[in-house]
Amino acid sequence: MRLVVCLVFLASFALVCQGHSSGYTRPLPKPSRPIFIRPIGCDVCYGIPSSTARLCCFRYGDCCHRG
């Protein structure tokens, strides 16, 4: 009896791993960079304080060069 229970468990686990039991079971890919809502100041690179430009550069990877 234990052998039957073990085999049923292994078979159901194999089906779940292959995606037959509940459809799509693969993990979703993670984004390469964290997704943040960017402040408007990062896109407008003139007329913003240098602290805002520095924050955008370090936090979002967008370096605003002030001219």
UniProtKB/Swiss-Prot annotation:
Q: Which GO terms describe its biological process?
A: defense response to bacterium; defense response to fungus; killing of cells of another organism
Where in this protein does the record say Arginine amide is found? Answer: 66
UniProt organism field:
Penaeus vannamei
Q: Does the keyword Ligase apply?
A: no
Extent of the signal sequence? 1-19
Highest taxon, organism lineage: Eukaryota
Molecular function GO terms recorded? chitin binding
Q: What task does this protein carry out?
A: Antibacterial and antifungal activity. Presents chitin-binding activity.
Q: What is this protein called?
A: Penaeidin-4a
Protein family = Belongs to the penaeidin family.
